[in-house]
Amino acid sequence: MISNNNIEKINELENPQIEISFDDVQEINETQTKGNEKNNQKNNKEYQQQKQRLKEKDYIELLKLIDTAKNYEYPSEEIKQQELKEKEKRVKEIVDEIVKMIEEYKN
């Protein structure tokens, strides 16, 4: 027959009672807090580095744009007139093609 003492031992094995003291809980919380602070510092450092890299990249792009603007040569009046003549010529060709198509359609 199983004694009461043995039944209690079996119950303890099946349902162990875990005792956690207040000090243990505090230690766990402090450890988690330190880990969180360390992660926050690491993430903040990475964020600041990324932010700095983006600033540097934007600054370089701005310098390139300024350099491009300084070296840009506006087209002379002669070039503008030549481009205008080419566009007028192309418009005339298109109109002639349309007129030709209309005449063919009539016939």
From Swiss-Prot:
Coiled coil: 26-107
Species lineage: Eukaryota, Amoebozoa, Evosea, Eumycetozoa, Dictyostelia
Superkingdom: Eukaryota
Compositional bias (Basic and acidic residues): 35-45
Protein name in the entry: Putative uncharacterized protein DDB_G0280941
Chain intervals for the UniProt region annotation (Disordered): 30-52
Species this protein is from: Dictyostelium discoideum (Social amoeba)
KW Coiled coil (keyword) present: yes
UniProt keyword terms in alphabetical order: Coiled coil
